[in-house]
Each structure stands twice: as C-alpha cells, then as structure tokens.
Regions:
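N-terminal hydrophobic/helix-forming segments and targeting peptides
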Residues: 1-244
Length: 244
C-alpha cells in the first residue's frame, strides 16, 4: 500500500531522498519533465486535455520532523537536537532510527525514581542509546550531523476507515497528489511539486513557487481535527466527517 510505504519511510527535513525515490517510482509513468531542483524538490508536469490551459501547481511536502546527531558521549550515547517542531514531553522512551544505516536506538532519560522534581526533561538532557559502550564505537556507527527519525509503523485500525502511523503530515498529501497524477490527465496543466524542508520554514515550497510560476497553486496539507478528544470542543467547526 502506497501510504504505508510513504509513512514508514524516513525523510527528516534536509534528507528526503528515501521519500523522493518512492514518489518518483509511483509517478514516472504518468508525467513528463521530472526534475529534482537544487534544494531537493521533485517536480513534474502533466499535460492537460486541451490547449492554452491554466497551469495549476499541486504541492505536498515530503519531509517530516525529527532530529540531528550533534555529538557522542564518552559512554557511547548520542547527543541530538530537534529538526522542526518537536515536543520534549513525548520523547523519553521513544524508539528511533539513526543515520543512513537506520541504526535502532531509544531516547533515554534519568529514571523516574531519580527525577524527583517531575519536570519535563529538556532535550539537551536526553540522549539516544544505540547500544554502543564507548565514544569510538558510537562514532563508528553514526556520524555527527546524521538525521534521526521516529521508528514507527503503519497499520489500519480494525473495523474503521482510520489508520495510525507517523508522518501523515504530509505523506497523506503526497499520497493524494500521486493518486491525482495516476488518474489524469485533466482540463488543466498540472505542475506537481513534492517539496522539501517544510517543517523548518517552507523552504522547498518557496523555491518551487518562484521557479515554476504557476497560474495558481493548491497545497495538500494535513492539520488537526476536532473529533479527538472532544467532538464538542468547537461545535461551529465540525471537521469530524470531513477533510480539513
């Protein structure tokens, strides 16, 4: 399933290559003029039905939030910093994959019985344990500057139309855009832009829009809905049954 493959791929902002390859394989037979620009966006063109058609850019970003390795401790643990908006509260105990080799690791913190003040542990005080016992061993497995992604899997929730997984922001958008291209052409010329580095400042989309200069653009993006945890939280904005 395409969404499963997209969701489980790791593409932290600045290194979206794994996601880009999945997208390329899915659209290459349905478009022309596939390009990867200098920042890493994958763009493609699909000629519409007719002449002198409007040029519509459909955009979805390939990247996800994550981390970067910033150093190695003497005991083999990794120091790291966030890429994109990561909430410190969710980190302790999370499984991650580190670097090009996708070395498995766990984000660790001071055991709860030693953390008497019960405050949220800041990211600077957390470490990633990759099973190394020395700085040299850790450096042999993972280099400074390598990306760290969440180790999660995709699954359908039984008996529902729902699914769980990571990076639905914005792999769902990528999946929808791929589906659009696979079912074209349409009475417009489509410029598909699978963009990079959205989570760190909309960088790829800015480059794509300036370079491609479409007549109009539609961005396929995810956001929160009000069905969880309280469907009555905002009764004037019922997004429960609909895309937002």
């Amino acid at each position: 399933m395409l969404l499963k493959e997209l969701s489980e791929a790791i593409g932290v902002s600045g290194d979206e290559s794994a996601v880009r390859q999945i997208v390329y394989n899915a659209i290459k037979d349905h478009v022309t003029d596939i390009e990867v620009d200098s920042i890493g966006n994958l763009t493609a063109f699909q000629k519409g039905i007719g002449d002198n058609l409007p040029r519509v850019m459909l955009a979805a970003h390939m990247d996800e939030i994550g981390f970067m390795v910033t150093g190695h401790d003497s005991n083999g643990n990794l120091r790291f910093a966030s890429i994109g908006g990561v909430d410190d509260r969710i980190l302790p105990g999370l499984r991650v994959k580190v670097g090009k080799k996708q070395v498995p690791g766990v984000i660790m913190w001071t055991p709860i019985h030693m953390n008497q003040d019960q405050n949220v542990t800041k990211m600077k005080d957390l470490r990633i344990d990759i099973g190394a016992s020395s700085k040299g061993e850790a450096e042999g497995k993972v280099g400074r500057g390598e990306r760290v992604g969440f180790d999660s899997y995709y699954e359908q929730i039984e008996g529902t139309r729902m699914a769980r997984g990571k990076s639905f922001d914005d792999r769902v958008g990528c999946s929808v855009l791929i589906d659009v291209l696979q079912n074209g052409p349409y009475p417009v010329d489509i410029i598909a832009a699978f963009t990079v580095q959205e989570e760190v400042g909309l960088r790829g989309a800015t480059v794509a829009a300036q370079r491609l200069k479409p007549d109009m653009a539609i961005v396929l993006e995810g956001t929160t809905a009000h069905d969880i945890p309280d469907p009555m939280a905002d009764p004037d904005d019922p997004t429960t049954p609909n895309p937002a």
